[in-house]
Amino acid sequence: PSSAASDVYKRQVVQYLKNQQVETIDYMISSHYDEDHLGGLVKCLDNFEVEHVLGSDYVHTSDLFNTFMNTATAHAIIVEYPSVGDTYEFGTGSFTVMAPDGISQNSNDNSVVIRLVNGNNSFMFMGDAEETSEQDMISTGMNLDCDVLSLGHHGSASSTSWDLLEASTPSWAVLSCGQDNSYGHPAASTMEKLRDMNIPVYRTDDQGTIIALSDGDTISWNQEPCNDYTAGDAKQQSANSDISQAAQYSSEDTASAPAVETETPDASSDTQGRTVWISATGSKYHSRPDCGNMNPNKATQETEAQALSQGYEACKKCW
């Protein structure tokens, strides 16, 4: 993302934690030092009391890495470099470091991977770890079983091997990737594996913020899995095609379409009288007909009040 957009995301991390009444961060874990994983942590160092910072023991040549290390030093925090097998008590549970087992030239394989256990519930957070790191974890013989697997490297083809999925047997997979990202994440091969194993999927590009709460016995979520196994590049191509078709349809019909008088709504009118768009499938209403994977040709218009009365909810992406 651009520096301006990146700064917005960093502020969102801080604001989310403040909304949860977080004042102290017991453990801040920097999986590795790529900008998309490190950026929000600097803001957190400046806004919260941080007890421990865990990171990977290598030097990244970037201004952001230098800022991160200098900010930690300014707050009298020494970055700790854990070893595989190190376990940390955390609330009613604990987490164990699963990787990296050594430092690689590939920064993604330097990701600190943890397995968090709370009672009968378990989560594994992969960072950007790729297949080499996955094989290292499997070779240790450590328990990789987890209820929730946060997929490595945004679902890229270089991560989430069959061996890892068979070793971890997750009940749910969480995929963090940007909407319409230029990398084409997630990869078709990754999504095919999840589909073939019937693993329910949550995706940030489809669903926004995803929250899982563990009480030690059950895991509750803020929404249902989307189970969208479409590859990122295919989704982008489909969206571009839909927009192109909609533009062509509009251009062809403009000349023959009768003039229609439209009435400008009174600015003081109830916002539930405003027009919204509803896709042919889905449970959300939208501010535009081409949000996400919507087909503009099949989108219909209703008032917001009508949409609400039918059980639709506002899309968090476009409102």
What are these regions (language model features)?
Residues 1-5, 9:
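Single conserved hydrophobic/aromatic residue that forms the stacking wall/gate
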Residues 35-74:
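Active-site HxH/HxHxD metal-binding segment of metal-dependent hydrolases
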Residues 59-96, 101-108, 179-253, 257:
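Binuclear metal-ion centers of metallo-dependent hydrolases, dominated by the metallo-beta-lactamase
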Residues 110-169:
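Metal-dependent phosphodiesterase/nuclease catalytic metal-binding core
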Residues 233-319:
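Mature, structured domains enriched in cysteine- and short glycine motifs
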